[in-house]
Amino acid sequence: MTRTRPQDRTQPPQTDPIRALLASPPDLPVVEVLPELRERLSPDPSASDDAGAGACLVLTAPPGTGKTTLVPPLLADVLTDVRADAPQRAPGRVVVTQPRRIAARAAARRLADLLGEEVGGTVGYAVRGERRAGPDTRIEVVTAGLLLRRLQRDPELSGVDAVILDEVHERSLDSDLLLALLTDARAALREDLTLVAMSATLDADRLRRILGGSSEGSSGVAPLVEVPGRLHPLEEVWAPPGHTGRLGPRGVPREFLTHVAATVERALTERSGDVLVFLPGAREVDDVVSRLRGAAPEGVDVLPLHGRLPASAQDAALAPSPAGRRRVVVSTNVAESSLTVPGVRVVVDSTLAREPRLDVARSMSGLVTVGVSRAAGVQRAGRAGREGPGVVYRCCSTTDWARSPLAPTPEILSADLTGAALELAVWGVPDGAGLAWVDEPPAAALAAAREALERLGLAGADGVTPLGRAVAGLPAGVREARALLATAPVLGARRAARATALLTADLRAPGGDLTALARQVRGGGAGSGAWKAEARRLEQACRRAALEQPGDPEAPDFASGGPQAPDTGRGREETGSPDAVGEGTRAHDLESAVALVAGTAQPQWIARRRGPAPQAGKEAHYASVAGTGLRLPAGSALAESEWLAVAGVDLTSGRGDALIRAAAPLAEQAALELAGAWLTEEERTVWEGGRLRTERLRRLGAITLTTTPGPPPGPTAVAEAVVARVRAEGADAGLAALPWDEEALGLRARLALLHEHLGEPWPDMSDAALAERAEEWLAPAVTSLAGQAGGANGANGPGGSASGQGSRRFNLERLDVAQALRALLPWPQASRLDELVPERIEVPSGSQVRVDYTAAIGGAAGATGSVDPAEAGRAGRPVLAVRVQECFGWAATPRIVEGRVAVLLHLLSPARRPVAVTDDLSSFWEQGYPQVRAEMRGRYPKHAWPEDPWNAPATRGTGRRR
């Protein structure tokens, strides 16, 4: 494929810093494979393209082997040679992706330092809100998410000759999605694009197949280059927390953080060198840092390292220790594989990690703290063995370690896929079909994400909407970006951007209170610099989008009565003249604006407090519109607020309430407007003792706003309530509430026997089946009974009485259950019911004796009619209880159900007590009867006990002794 460029770049100078670095590289293990890499990465000269087809390659290398440092310059040098053979084309850039912003900046600085340059020259970087690159940049380090947006804007990646996907073993959602789209673009548009995937631990086979198949018509596998590691001996020390667990029902216990800090102090005493501590999140990092700074020995510096810190603080943590001093670097998993922390000889691992999760049952997505995988734990430990013998202190037991998963769960299998679904819709493959995935996105999670996009007005049956395309182009999450565009016409672009930045700048809200965070950053406190930079970036993006995208027709109509947003319950301030996106003359201050933006971003998380405000220092619990339980951190100032707009949560590993990590107070009216799509009114009929009561409920999703009495329930409502009660109490208990008389029990047993032996269309009589089909047989009977004046509204009769507003008494005892069951009889087979399972059988005496069919179901029906489906038709047989004298001369045992079932005869004494049980009369007369006769003739001398029962006449009463 031949491409033309707007202008040619200047050829590299005579003294090429990249070539100089490769001529004298640092002593790193990757140097051993550089010749092989150069050979593998040289494009195929046999390709039709004038520069040859781009290479694809998978590189596996342990952390610390130098792959991020030396592979990008090697590839840039290879491409320079290629372009020298094709002078009509200027060399393009090598773009290197990193999973995190901090890693991208650090990698670029490290490489630029080796080249003897400042960042922004030969080597640059670009992350969200910051870019240092220029026209001479040949290697650019970016985050996967940023390259994903570039690829969506320009699928050909103009000006890029190679992409290196670094740390792909971390399996971030952006990284997996980027790999799928890059291979798709390469196959269709850019066969000359070189792709390299670099991994520390991932099984490379799947990657090799994906990259090997990214050329049109190719079905091979990409070559694999393995870099040997040079880890020094590593000692393991197990430091479990004793009786204190690593995880409690509400996250990481403070007692465990105390244990981690104590383990660090122990390591400082027992070992030499710097200490690297791994904790699951920024909150835990700051907690342990504060503990250690007050207890660390003289000459020890304690430094935090996480993504929320300013770049200067991150750089300080990554710098070598000053002479004569030791460092303790307390980090999240950012230092796990993609960063180099020099001087580390000791690792203290909390063995915990924080990962994104989609909780389908609770309709929530958020971060959850889990035990670290063994693969990640090994990587953490390896940080101690790069410069010499090291040691890892693991804050768990060997049993816990053995139970740890082998590898972390890929985000694509566990996280919310709404953002990924929007990217796929913009790419033109909403279902992801045809893309090469390391792991395909789960169908259910992707379907839920696509439904969410439709609700947000970002995608539909015809693909991505203009609004969805605008949202995808904004440097923020899907919901936050949409909230920015939706609220800008009301708040103004600047105020909306400032409020949205409180949600997206990765700042910690004190006590989960976004309004407190707003006051903090507005007053120049912690995080103010990051917030201002984020706000400026969002404002610029919002104004660009406003010029290209008309208003969102799906957004809440806040401005229907003028440029007023819902009253969130906070104060207002005057604004200047309207700006380009329609800033009104009155709008909320920052504290009110963040409530509006948060409620617009996550309306399903708007929540109302359960009960009164808690006592000081206690947790407040809330119920959300989506029905999920939420809780504030203990002592949060937000606990006084009845309503909250919740923007972020941390999930617990159990089923407890999710922890609110970002929220703002909200007035009830604002909550109703922001979550108006969930506002409903309904009537329901409920049981209260023996009385049925109708309620009118006004609800905001799962939140009940008001409950008022309704009119007395009509017959249909009564029937629905009875059916609901049967199901709600469980099939067996619910059916037991019905008045099962002998006729109903018998009919049910007869039908159960037919279903067992003849199958369909004879109905299943099990508890579960009857409950499932209750609308067919039970509801009509209840409706009919409730419609009878005496059956439901009689003043004092057995049907009950109507009394109390919105209620009526309904007496189930009047229900004819047998008649109700007949509604299930199949037609025309119903006419054969008495033939197949007769109620009575005529015996030789002429008596019509009732058959006991309940015995055929093992007596399980009992007095309640409850049938165990596992026993139905198998625990016994129908019983015919008849006196011996009425059966004289009867040779053949009666059979029913087309001869399939023999009736079990209970032969009775004159006192109607069983003297024999048989289903073989012939054998009984020959073998059993003589003994019965011998025992009974003296006890009942007035009754016939003939020696020859075959020929004796059957009799109902007493007879002369024979």
Where are these regions (language model features)?
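Short, isolated positions in well-ordered beta-strands
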Residues: 232, 630, 848-850
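Acidic, serine/threonine- and proline-rich low-complexity intrinsically disordered segments
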Residues: 459, 494-621, 626-629, 642-840, ...
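Short, surface-exposed, low-complexity cationic segments
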Residues: 635-657, 855-896, 903, 907
